[in-house]
């Protein structure tokens, strides 16, 4: 039966799944004690959704489902507010697309941009090996964390969601990822 579903129907079903997940996030946020800044959260979601459009996770689900899940952890399990939720929604945009931290700052302001920058890995190539890159990423995370503890809390939410979804990875990738998560 799956073969009979047209590409447009699959895309429509994915869009509905994404919209439902985002609505759940908004409903969760609205149930919190935080001041209600739905507009900025919706703006961050729309921006991230467009930036990750057409990208899939290893599980086959739309990539945007990961930032939504991280934002839900940030909201529901850690109890952070709109700035952190926006940063969670945007946390992979700079790393995985052509957008820059400056773009994020121009659209969402300096605080969200600073947090997103703290969550963005330093790109490889300038460091000789993986261990050096990991050390530099850890150093960057610590320096940013000293300015804003939300960076480490969102990073923990990101790693937590990745660990919860290890079942969709190949066994070799699981080992590589779990060693990264331990770092």
Name these PLM-found stretches.
Residues 1-179:
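Active-site helical microenvironments for divalent-metal-assisted chemistry
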């Amino acid at each position: 039966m799956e073969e009979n579903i047209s590409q447009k129907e699959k895309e429509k079903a994915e869009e509905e799944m994404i919209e439902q997940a985002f609505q759940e996030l908004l409903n969760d946020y609205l149930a919190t004690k935080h001041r209600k800044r739905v507009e900025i959260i919706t703006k961050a979601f729309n921006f991230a959704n467009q930036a990750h459009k057409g990208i899939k996770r290893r599980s086959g689900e739309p990539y945007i489902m990961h930032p939504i899940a991280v934002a839900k952890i940030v909201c529901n399990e850690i109890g952070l507010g709109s700035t952190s939720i926006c940063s969670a929604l945007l946390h992979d945009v700079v790393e995985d697309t052509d957008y820059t931290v400056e773009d994020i700052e121009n659209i969402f302001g300096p605080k969200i941009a600073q947090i997103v920058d703290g969550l963005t890995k330093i790109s490889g190539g300038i460091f000789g090996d993986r261990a050096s890159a990991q050390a530099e990423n850890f150093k960057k995370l610590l320096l940013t964390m000293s300015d804003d503890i939300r960076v480490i809390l969102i990073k923990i939410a990101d790693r937590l969601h990745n660990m919860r979804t290890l079942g969709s990875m190949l066994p070799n990738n699981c080992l590589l990822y779990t060693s990264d998560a331990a770092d």
